[in-house]
């Protein structure tokens, strides 16, 4: 009854797309709006519905498709079946794009993606090309995860070794508990180490004091709270971390194939991907324009919500 009072452009619905190598067969996709179809991909640890406040003013012109990556949001119970999680996510997104094009009778659609979601798109472009994507908005994501002799633009920049060592120590500490499914059954020290590491990652993603204060507020757990904390995505996040550390994830060779229009949105204070190296990505892309939000870190919607909305709106309007 209440839902019926909400105008159609502002209502959300959950659609399900058949994807390969999935026990229940389908992946949930949150859909909102009326108009041109747009695919929007979320970041690591994010619920895709966190995009909704930015989309509401645009829902009379665009219909947004927000897939939930396996292990997160409405798909938190859907496991990965491959170690290469970016590759499996790319397979899922290929199925989603094919289905949207079929539903909407389109040859291609616009895509916007942030952080891990953007890394998934590099993997998608490597496997499936650009035929089904008309335009692409890449949000604070580089082409290669690991620093190399000819590439120092990897994750965490000059601090990569330091931060990756922290991740590896956490993974090593959890090895003997691989058989444990519930976070509640882990020893307190490992639970604390896990939540502290996640908080560190989140704080590195933000640059604005208000954003960091919000992260502290949302992630702080007292010892008593930690006892009962049901961390449902714990194992999935560890899987992703293992893959990030072990697999090369270098998509630089893909850049020259992206002849479609690309907008490269960069957080000018990003600590996850050095803005100077992100600008090199712009130069490597044949048909790219660059937008820098000078006061934003990696978490662009959190640090610069107005700027993020304006760039997204401009991208959709082809401005």
Segments the model singles out, each with a brief description of its role:
Residues 1-39, 59-63, 87-88, 101-104, ...:
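Alpha/beta-hydrolase fold catalytic core
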Residues 27-77:
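Conserved HGGG/HGGXW glycine-rich cap/lid loop of the alpha/beta-hydrolase fold
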Residues 45, 69-73, 118, 143, ...:
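Alpha/beta-hydrolase active-site loop signature
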Residues 50-52, 75-81, 148-149, 275-276:
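Conserved catalytic-core motifs of eukaryotic protein kinase domains, centered on the activation segment
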Residues 56, 66-112, 116, 125-129, ...:
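Active-site loop/oxyanion-hole signature of alpha/beta-hydrolase fold enzymes
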Residues 134-186:
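Flexible "cap/lid" loop of the alpha/beta hydrolase fold
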Residues 296-305, 309:
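Catalytic histidine-centered segment of alpha/beta-hydrolase-like enzymes
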């Amino acid at each position: 009854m209440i839902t019926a009072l909400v105008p159609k452009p502002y209502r959300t619905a959950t659609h399900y797309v058949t994807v390969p190598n999935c026990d229940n067969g389908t992946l949930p996709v949150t859909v909102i709006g009326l108009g041109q179809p747009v695919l929007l991909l979320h970041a690591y640890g994010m619920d895709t519905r966190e995009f909704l406040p930015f989309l509401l003013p645009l829902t009379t012109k665009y219909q947004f498709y927000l897939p939930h990556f396996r292990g997160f949001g409405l798909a938190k119970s859907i496991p990965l079946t491959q170690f290469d999680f970016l590759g499996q996510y790319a397979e899922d997104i290929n199925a989603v794009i094919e289905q949207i094009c079929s539903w909407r009778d389109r040859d291609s659609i616009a895509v916007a993606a942030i952080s891990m979601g953007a890394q998934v798109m590099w993997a998608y472009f490597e496997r499936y090309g650009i035929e089904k994507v008309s335009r692409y908005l890449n949000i604070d994501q580089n082409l290669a995860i690991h620093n190399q002799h000819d590439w120092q633009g990897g994750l965490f920049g000059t601090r990569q070794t330091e931060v990756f060592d922290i991740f590896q120590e956490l993974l090593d500490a959890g090895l003997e508990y691989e058989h444990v499914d519930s976070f509640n059954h882990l020893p307190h020290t490992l639970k604390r180490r896990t939540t502290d590491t996640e908080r560190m990652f989140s704080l590195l993603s933000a640059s604005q004091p208000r954003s960091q204060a919000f992260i502290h507020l949302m992630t702080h757990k007292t010892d008593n709270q930690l006892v009962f904390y049901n961390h449902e995505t714990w194992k999935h996040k560890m899987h992703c971390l293992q893959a990030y550390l072990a697999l090369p994830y270098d998509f630089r060779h893909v850049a020259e194939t992206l002849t479609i229009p690309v907008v490269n949105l960069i957080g000018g204070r990003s600590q996850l991907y050095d803005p100077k190296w992100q600008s090199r990505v712009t130069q490597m892309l044949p048909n790219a324009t660059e937008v820098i939000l000078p006061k934003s870190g990696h978490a662009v919607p959190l640090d610069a919500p107005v700027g993020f909305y304006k760039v997204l709106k401009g991208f959709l309007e082809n401005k």
